C-alpha cells in the first residue's frame, strides 16, 4: 500500500522546521547507507548526532504517532528516529531497497523496517526533479508532494529519488517497525478501519458495525506482534 497523507505538518510548522534545517551543517548522505545503497546515493544528510536533528526528529515522530490516519496505515510499534536529507545540484539516489534492519544509534537494538515514509519539507515549485519513484506490484509511482505532506509505502519496495536540477529538495525520511509486518495484512486492516469509520459517520454504532469492529480487532489480535 502506498498512501499519501496531506497536511501532517502545518505551514507554520514547516517554516519553523525549514528555518532550523537551512541553518544546519549537512554531511554526506552515505553515512547511513548500506554497502549497495552507498554506490547510488548522492545527497546531503543531517548527522544523527546533531542537536537540531535530534530535536526535529522527536517532533516529527511525536506528530506522526498522534496522527490517526498514519497510525491506522502503519500500525507503528517502533520508529527508527526520523532523519533529514537534502538534494541539490544534480544529487539523486538510484534504485535501491531499504535495509531490512536498522540499528538504533550506539546500540545493538535493531528496528525491522516494515514501513518507509517521506515527509516533504519543500514545495514542488521550489525545485525541479527530485521525484520519489516507488516500484511495487501495482506499477511505478512518481511522488512529489506539497511541504507538510507525507507518503507511506512498504519498505520492500524498490525506489529512487530522481536528480534535482534546480533548487533544493528537503525532506524527513524514516522507517517504522509495524505491529503487523506483512503489507497485505496491513492494507486489509487499513481498508477495514477506513470503512468502519465511514459507516459509523453515516449510520452510528449499529449492531452490524459493532460486529465489523470486533472482526477488525480480532484480526489485529491474530496478526499483531507485540
Curated annotation (Swiss-Prot):
Cofactor binding description: Binds 1 Fe(2+) ion per subunit.
EC number(s) on file: 1.14.11.-
Domain named Fe2OG dioxygenase: residues: 78-178
InterPro entries named among the record's database cross-references: Oxoglu/Fe-dep_dioxygenase_dom, PKHD_C, PKHD_hydroxylase, Pro_4_hyd_alph, Pro_4_hyd_alph_FE2OG_OXY
GO biological process: DNA damage response; intracellular iron ion homeostasis
Binding site for Fe cation: 96, 98, 159
A Pfam family reported for this protein in Swiss-Prot or TrEMBL: 2OG-FeII_Oxy_3
Molecular function per GO: 2-oxoglutarate-dependent dioxygenase activity; iron ion binding; L-ascorbic acid binding
Signal peptide: none
Alphabetic keyword roster: Dioxygenase, Iron, Metal-binding, Oxidoreductase, Vitamin C
Domain of life: Bacteria
UniProt xrefs under SMART domains: P4Hc
Entries under HAMAP family matching the protein: Hydroxyl_YbiX (MF_00657)
Name under which the protein is recorded: PKHD-type hydroxylase LHK_00496
